[in-house]
Amino acid sequence: MNVKQLHTQAESIFGKRGQLLHLWQEIADNFYPERADFTLRRQPGDEFADHLMTSYPVLVRRELAGQIGTMLRPSATPWFKMVPSDPEREDNDSKRWLEWATGLQRRAMYDPASAFSRAMKEGDNDFAAFGQPAISTELVWDNPNENGPHLLYRCWHLRDM
């Protein structure tokens, strides 16, 4: 497949997104007005939720997103750990190293510079409303405002995917 064929295929696939964007716009209008800009662009000063008769759908989505985050990532208890893919390689030294690496990963994720909590909270809201989030993880090497390299988590708007 050459570049021209790949470009043609991408244009065809993205051209079929129109109906999906309209569906997401309708869902967002009713359940997630903060993200209701799939098919329109907001101007400063626009009212974004003035069409809602009640805030109940928005509150239900927010509550569901909060519950998803609480169940999947309880901040008070460790919710993940590293293990070897081959159980036979799990000896005392490897367990100690994996425990250390798990702690290092947890500290990197919950470092305020990583924005992990914010990205996951946005992702939980996207999942509650649309059934899927778009989350990326990056390694930032040269940020003069931070001390050394760190992870950066971002939740992207589905319209941009």
Annotate each language-model stretch with its function:
Residues 1-161:
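Extended, helix-rich architectural segments
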